[in-house]
Amino acid sequence: MERQISYRSLSKIPGLFSLLLAATLSRLAGRMFVLTLVLFALARFSSPVLAGWLTFAAIVPGLIVSPLAGVLLDCVGPTIAVRIDMIASTAFITAISLAGWLGWSSPPVVCTLAMLFSLAGPLGIAGIRTLLPRLVPPHALDQANALDTAVYSIVDVVGPAMAGGLVGWLGPEAAMSLIAAACAGAAVCLSQVQRLPGLASSRTSLLRQAIKGIYVVVRQPTLRGLAVSQSLYQMTWGALHVVIPVFVAGNYTVAAGSTVVGLLWALVGIAGGVGALLAGHLCTTGRERHIMTAGMAVTAFATWPIAAEFGFRGLTIGLLLAGAMSGPIDVAMLTLRQRRTNPRQLGRVMSISISVNQAGFPLGAAIAGVVITESLSAIFVLAGITSVLAAIATLSIPPDATPVA
C-alpha cells in the first residue's frame, strides 16, 4: 500500500497549486456574485421580489443543464471546460457591471445575463473536482480533497463578508467589476494547469450521452446511494439556515441578531475547514461509508437535542459540532464518488450528482419555512431526522467489492 503524503508535499504535484488557487478565486467570485446581485437589484430597482428572481436566475438554469454540461466536460476535457466557465463568468459579470454604469441595467437585461452566467457554472464546479483525481496520485487524493473542501469552507466565510463590504464601500457596479477580475485571475491561474484531454467519445450526441449519464447515476448503487444520502444531508442544512435566524431573533435585538447569525455561520465555516483538513490525515480510502455515517449521526445529535434544547450555548456547540463533521463527510463523499466512477464518465457524474445534492438544501429550507410558524423545536427535530435518514442511506451503499460502473 502506498503511504499518504503531507499537505506540504502536495505542492510538488505539477499544476495542483495553480488549480487550487484558480478554484479559490472562482468560488470566491461565485459566492460574492449571488449576494452582490441581490444588493445590485435592491440598489437599482428597490425590489426584493426582483432580487429573489435574479437569485433564481443565477442558480437554477445551471442545475437544469448540468447533465449536458457534464457530457461537454467529458468530451472536451476538464481543463478546457473549467476555462470556458471562468472566461464566460468574467464576460457576463463584466456586462452586468457595465450595464449598471451605462444606465442599461433594466430587469430583463440583468436577468438574462444572470441566466447566462448560471449556464456555464456546472462546467467549473464539476470540472475542478474532475481534474483533481487526474492530477493527483491515489495515495494523495484524501489530502487534495480535504484542501478542496477547506477552500469551500473558507469561501463560505469570506465571500459574503467581502461582497457586503465592497458594495457598501464602492457600490454594486464596482463590486461586480472586482468579482469579474477575480474570475479573470482564476482563468490566468488555470493556464498553468496541464491540459487534460476528454476521455469520452464525441461521436454520440450530447443529449444521448446526457441521458446515459443520468441512467448511470440512477443505476449505479454507489452513485444512487450518495445522491439520496447527500440530498437528505443537505436538507438538514437547508432547515438550519431558516431556523437559526429565527432562534437568534428570540434572544437578541434585530441589529445584534444579524451580527450574531453572521458570526455563527462564520464559526460553522471555520469548523468545517478544520474538520476537512483533519479528515485528510484519516486515510478515508476504503472507510468512506463509515466516516460519512458516523459524521451524519453526530450531526443529527448535534442538531437535536444539543442545538434545540440547551439555549444559545447549546445552539453554538451544536452548530460547531455539525460544522466540524461536515468536513470529513464531504472529503469521504468526494473520495468515494471519484473511486467508484468510471473516469470516462466522471465529468457528467460529478455534474449531475452535485446538482442533485444541491436540490436537498432548498427543499429543507422550504419545509422549514412552512413548519416554523408552528414550532421551532420541530424544525430541529426535522433536521436531525434527515441526517439520520442520510446515515441510513449511506450504510446502504455497497462495500468496496462492488465494481466500478
Swiss-Prot record:
Entry's localization field:
Cell membrane
Q: Kindly indicate whether the keyword Transmembrane belongs to this entry.
A: yes
- SUPFAM superfamilies, A to Z: MFS general substrate transporter
Per the record, membrane topology reads:
Multi-pass membrane protein
Q: Which GO terms fall under molecular function for this chain's record?
A: transmembrane transporter activity
Write out the entry's keywords from A to Z. Answer: Cell membrane, Membrane, Plasmid, Transmembrane, Transmembrane helix
Assigned protein family:
Belongs to the major facilitator superfamily.
What protein name does the entry list?
A: Uncharacterized MFS-type transporter y4rN
